[in-house]
């Protein structure tokens, strides 16, 4: 929806075609040329007012083997067969990172379940045993948000707060009423270094942080 409906509506269908064509010719004319998709095709798509595509997918959350396609994109109008590959590239680049994070979380959860069963004497919640602290290592807030949301399919701990809002928006949940994800008051190297500069000695620093 974000890309196939909202983005195309805001930046293509709801923009006057002359403006679309001017920008198209400016960018492609200065880089790879404008013969790939000519003005006639663009105008026909703009006049149509929507993307004539059918997207079919396995049910969300389904784990599939390698070589099993998870989505299939088909055109629904004979004049726009060229559109499929264009959209496939965009969908692929928006999906793979989230899918990898979900798979990593799933694999870690299997390991946690196995060894928690072997070594834990209490009924510790398995979903609270690992957490996501990856936000500062991601390339954007959007990537961090979706990656953490995917990880939260297997674990409930994340320091990526925007992921909680993303999950609420997309999955109709409410963190004030049900477990969605949890954060924690914690510290790490930069916090410890900056606080040490303030306190001047380790004992004072630790005492203040614990209190």
Indicate residue ranges for each PLM-predicted region.
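Active-site-flanking structural segment that lines cofactor/substrate pockets
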Residues: 26-60
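Low-complexity, highly charged intrinsically disordered N-terminal segments
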Residues: 1-37
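Buried, small/hydrophobic-residue-enriched core segments of structured protein domains
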Residues: 43-52, 61-64, 70-211
């Amino acid at each position: 929806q974000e890309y196939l409906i909202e983005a195309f509506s805001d930046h293509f269908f709801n923009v006057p075609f002359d403006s679309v064509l001017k920008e198209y010719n400016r960018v492609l004319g200065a880089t790879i040329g404008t013969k790939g998709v000519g003005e006639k095709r663009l105008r026909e798509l703009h006049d149509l007012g929507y993307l004539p595509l059918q997207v079919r997918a396995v049910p969300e959350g389904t784990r599939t083997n390698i070589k099993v396609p998870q989505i299939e994109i088909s055109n629904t109008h004979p004049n726009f067969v060229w559109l499929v590959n264009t959209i496939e590239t965009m969908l692929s680049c928006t999906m793979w990172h989230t899918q990898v994070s979900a798979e990593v979380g799933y694999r870690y959860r299997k390991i946690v379940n196995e060894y928690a069963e072997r070594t834990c004497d209490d009924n510790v919640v398995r979903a609270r045993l690992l957490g996501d602290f990856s936000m500062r290592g991601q390339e954007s807030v959007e990537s961090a948000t979706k990656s953490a949301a995917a990880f939260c399919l297997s674990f409930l701990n994340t320091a990526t707060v925007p992921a909680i809002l993303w999950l609420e928006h997309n999955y109709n949940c409410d963190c004030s009423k049900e477990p969605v994800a949890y954060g924690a008051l914690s510290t790490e190297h930069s916090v410890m270094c900056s606080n040490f500069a303030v306190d001047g000695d380790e004992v004072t620093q630790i005492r203040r942080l614990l209190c």
